[in-house]
């Protein structure tokens, strides 16, 4: 039976979101959430979780290219812990190195420079995080 998974691309001003099913291994971008210094509107996240009823959540883990942690790493881990605490769903962290670069390249390829809107980049980054998580399973 297919499991629904939600993924998040954590950021201090915007949090990308994507949904996917493990049976297909593909993800679809959802609208991004605005955040204030990394704090989202939890009611908006709750609404998406209620709508999609995921079995687990995946949060992108920002790391330096050499695999070491960066300042945003701890904040992403804290966000993952809060998701788990608020919604009582299993949360996994997924290495997100280069997802933003890949997302920008994908958007640029589709629509050129004008298409590079931040919320689209965050949603596609969340898709790439989820798809890489599926591949690692």
From Swiss-Prot:
Domain of life: Bacteria
EC top class, as a word: hydrolase
Native organism: Actinobacillus pleuropneumoniae serotype 7 (strain AP76)
Pfam families xref list: RuvX
GO biological process per UniProt: rRNA 5'-end processing
PANTHER family per record: POLYNUCLEOTIDYL TRANSFERASE, RIBONUCLEASE H-LIKE SUPERFAMILY PROTEIN (PTHR33317:SF4)
Protein name: Putative pre-16S rRNA nuclease
NCBIfam families per the UniProt record, alphabetical: RNAse_H_YqgF (TIGR00250)
Function: Could be a nuclease involved in processing of the 5'-end of pre-16S rRNA.
Enzyme Commission number(s) from the entry: 3.1.-.-
Assigned protein family: Belongs to the YqgF nuclease family.
GO molecular function: nuclease activity
GO (cellular component) term, any one: cytosol
Entry-linked HAMAP family: Nuclease_YqgF
Location of this chain's protein in the cell: Cytoplasm
InterPro entries (alphabetical): RNaseH-like_sf, YqgF, YqgF/RNaseH-like_dom, YqgF/RNaseH-like_dom_sf
Entry keywords, A to Z: Cytoplasm, Hydrolase, Nuclease, Ribosome biogenesis
